[in-house]
């Protein structure tokens, strides 16, 4: 699996999909002692996902997030991968490979580009683009900045990312440091769009992924009128990019 299929950053924004809440009190990520919820989907299957709307989901204390209300999304799956944790980290740092990811738009009944631009940054400054992050940077725990532009927004957003590797268990945290805007209107303030991504090797050749994302307010207005299936397909496209698994979109 090449690095192009392993970056996962846009999950922080694009998996915030209105798929309906559930009766559980909230997600259980791998950082908790309880069994993960949602549980990991089998390899080759669509990842399990759950969405909690305002005031429904309880934020896990182990995330370190504040208990502000908003939308909370969890996604969990397994994928086959013969590389190492370092290989995955290199893929995560390959920000430029996010550009051009495509998804099936149920609203427009056709394939569309999901991310129109993406690049690593020297700091929280759009005027300081740089090459993709090196492995030494990914394993240092340093603050790493990148920017990406969603096809529905058209304006770049700057994110801060930090990664850690504990015995092959990867944890990547991401949050926006610039506001999310459209047509000069601020939709989400800095720090109100956060995600944590957990990757661990279940057994040789088999990895688990658990992603958790929250936003102070759902960003649905940013995209205008879009069918629910299109949001789901965005998440599926990003998961396919990460894992290399061919997952059929919802049509």
Where are these regions (language model features)?
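Bacterial N-terminal signal peptides that target proteins for export
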Residues: 1-9
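Bacterial N-terminal signal peptides
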Residues: 10-18
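Sec/Tat signal peptide C-region and signal peptidase I cleavage site
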Residues: 19-23
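Hydrophobic ligand-binding cavity/cleft-lining segments
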Residues: 26-152
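Hydrophobic/aromatic beta-strand elements that line small-molecule binding cavities or substrate pockets
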Residues: 158-165, 194-201
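A short acidic/glycine-rich loop-to-helix N-cap element
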Residues: 183-188, 215-234
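A short, solvent-exposed beta-edge/loop patch
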Residues: 195-226
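A conserved amphipathic terminal alpha-helix motif
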Residues: 223-251
């Amino acid at each position: 699996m090449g690095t192009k299929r392993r970056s996962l950053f846009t999950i922080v924004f694009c998996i915030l999909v209105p798929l309906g809440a559930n009766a559980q009190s909230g997600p259980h990520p791998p950082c908790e002692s309880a069994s993960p919820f949602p549980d990991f989907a089998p390899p080759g299957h669509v990842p399990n996902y759950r969405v909690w709307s305002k005031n429904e989901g309880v934020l896990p204390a182990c995330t370190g997030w504040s208990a502000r209300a908003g939308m909370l999304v969890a996604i969990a799956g397994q994928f086959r991968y013969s590389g190492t944790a370092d290989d995955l980290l290199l893929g995560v740092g390959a920000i430029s490979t996010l550009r051009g990811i495509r998804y099936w738009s149920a609203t427009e009944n056709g394939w569309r580009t999901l991310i129109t631009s993406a690049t690593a940054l020297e700091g929280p400054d759009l005027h300081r683009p740089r090459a993709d992050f090196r492995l030494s940077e990914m394993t240092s725990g340093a603050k790493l900045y990148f920017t990406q532009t969603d096809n529905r927004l058209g304006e770049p957003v700057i994110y801060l990312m930090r990664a850690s590797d504990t015995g092959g268990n990867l944890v990547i945290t991401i949050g926006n440091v610039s506001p999310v805007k459209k047509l000069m209107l601020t939709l989400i303030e800095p720090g109100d769009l956060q995600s944590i991504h957990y990757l661990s090797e279940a057994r040789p050749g088999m990895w688990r992924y658990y992603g958790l994302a929250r936003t102070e307010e759902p960003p649905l207005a940013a995209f205008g009128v879009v069918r629910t299936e299109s949001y789901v397909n965005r998440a599926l496209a990003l998961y396919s990019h990460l894992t290399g698994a061919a997952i059929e979109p919802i049509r």
